[in-house]
């Protein structure tokens, strides 16, 4: 039946895996914040950017979609909301096009389910270079973001016995796939490619000032209740330690304290800290009262 088929070696190029997705810091923060807000359910959104060249996809911004998901799947895209959101973004100066979509996998890694594959197929019908980004907000900790980008493999290549994709890249390293992603069809139904997060000067200044304290932070009143509870626990622990010292008749008390917490010293430090904080809070309360009564 397929006797006349020559295969991908007849001069036709196969899909290249050396593309790189450049995600801006703003887009990455939005994806992580949106994903953490939806835990334990999946959330999804669209990515805005441009196709710079044949090997680069640039993502500059994202916006969330009002879809609700289960712990393993997420609903399809709402086209009405997408059109309204795109018109609003154009009015605010965002003229980028949709380059793909993202969704979260809270706690179970980066891969594509059958529903995700069908959603990606609908995107690739509109644009062959559409990208599906998966982010895990639970496994993503400070300094390491668990994220991956995928694109589908043409099923006809596998049926006809052709090579699904080729790797021709000078990136310099290969990303080792996880076992769960291989089980769910990585390099069989879809493939992964490199992700980079570049920061310009403005984004770098923004990230450096993200948690920077200002003069207004010094006017905030702290939580006094937690300080009191901590002091009460220290008093109870010091009382128990004092009773234990009474029972050490005929023994060296200094040797019994070796390797144990000195609750008396901690209690004195906590008292000095509380006195200083009470003085500051009294001053702040007077300042607030003077400001709001004028």
UniProtKB/Swiss-Prot annotation:
InterPro entries: JAMM/MPN+_dom (IPR000555), JAMM_MPN+_peptidase_M67A (IPR050242), MPN (IPR037518). The keyword RNA-binding does not apply. Belongs to the peptidase M67A family. The keyword Metal-binding applies. The 26S proteasome consists of a 20S proteasome core and two 19S regulatory subunits. The 20S proteasome core is composed of 28 subunits that are arranged in four stacked rings, resulting in a barrel-shaped structure. The two end rings are each formed by seven alpha subunits, and the two central rings are each formed by seven beta subunits. The catalytic chamber with the active sites is on the inside of the barrel. PANTHER family: EUKARYOTIC TRANSLATION INITIATION FACTOR 3 -RELATED. Keywords: Cytoplasm, Hydrolase, Metal-binding, Metalloprotease, Nucleus, Protease, Proteasome, Zinc. This is 26S proteasome regulatory subunit RPN11. GO terms for biological process: proteolysis. It comes from Encephalitozoon cuniculi (strain GB-M1) (Microsporidian parasite). GO terms for cellular component: cytoplasm; nucleus; proteasome complex. Zn(2+) binds at residues 103, 105, 116. Its main location: cytoplasm. Acts as a regulatory subunit of the 26S proteasome which degrades poly-ubiquitinated proteins in the cytoplasm and in the nucleus. It is essential for the regulated turnover of proteins and for the removal of misfolded proteins. The proteasome is a multicatalytic proteinase complex that is characterized by its ability to cleave peptides with Arg, Phe, Tyr, Leu, and Glu adjacent to the leaving group at neutral or slightly basic pH. It is found in: Cytoplasm; Nucleus. GO terms for molecular function: metal ion binding; metallopeptidase activity. A motif (JAMM motif) lies at residues 103-116. Pfam families: JAB (PF01398). Residues 21-156 form the MPN domain. Gene3D superfamilies: Cytidine Deaminase, domain 2 (3.40.140.10).
């Amino acid at each position: 039946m397929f006797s006349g088929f020559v295969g991908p070696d007849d001069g036709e190029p196969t899909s290249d895996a050396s593309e790189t997705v450049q995600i801006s810091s703003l887009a990455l923060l939005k994806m992580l914040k949106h994903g953490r807000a939806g835990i334990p359910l999946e959330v999804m959104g669209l990515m805005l950017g441009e196709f710079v060249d044949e090997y680069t996809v640039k993502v500059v911004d994202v916006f969330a979609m009002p879809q609700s998901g289960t712990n393993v799947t997420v609903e399809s895209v709402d086209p009405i909301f997408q059109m309204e959101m795109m018109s609003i973004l154009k009015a605010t100066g965002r003229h980028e096009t949709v380059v793909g979509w993202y969704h979260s996998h809270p706690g179970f890694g980066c891969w594509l389910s059958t529903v995700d594959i069908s959603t990606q197929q609908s995107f690739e019908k509109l644009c062959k270079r559409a990208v599906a980004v998966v982010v895990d907000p639970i496994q993503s900790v400070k300094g390491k973001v668990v994220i991956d980008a995928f694109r589908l493999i043409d099923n006809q290549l596998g049926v006809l016995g052709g090579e699904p994709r080729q790797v021709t890249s000078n990136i310099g390293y290969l990303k080792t796939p996880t076992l769960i992603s291989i089980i769910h069809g990585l390099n069989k139904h879809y493939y992964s490619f490199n992700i980079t997060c570049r920061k310009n000067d403005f984004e770098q200044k923004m990230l450096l000032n993200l948690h920077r304290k200002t003069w207004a932070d010094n006017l905030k009143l702290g939580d006094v209740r937690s300080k009191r509870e901590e002091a009460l626990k220290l008093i109870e622990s010091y009382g128990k330690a004092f009773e234990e010292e009474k029972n050490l008749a005929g023994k060296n008390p200094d040797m019994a304290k070796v390797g144990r917490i000195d609750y008396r010293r901690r209690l004195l430090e906590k008292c000095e800290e509380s006195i200083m904080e009470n003085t500051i809070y009294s001053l702040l309360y007077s300042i607030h009262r003077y400001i709001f009564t004028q």
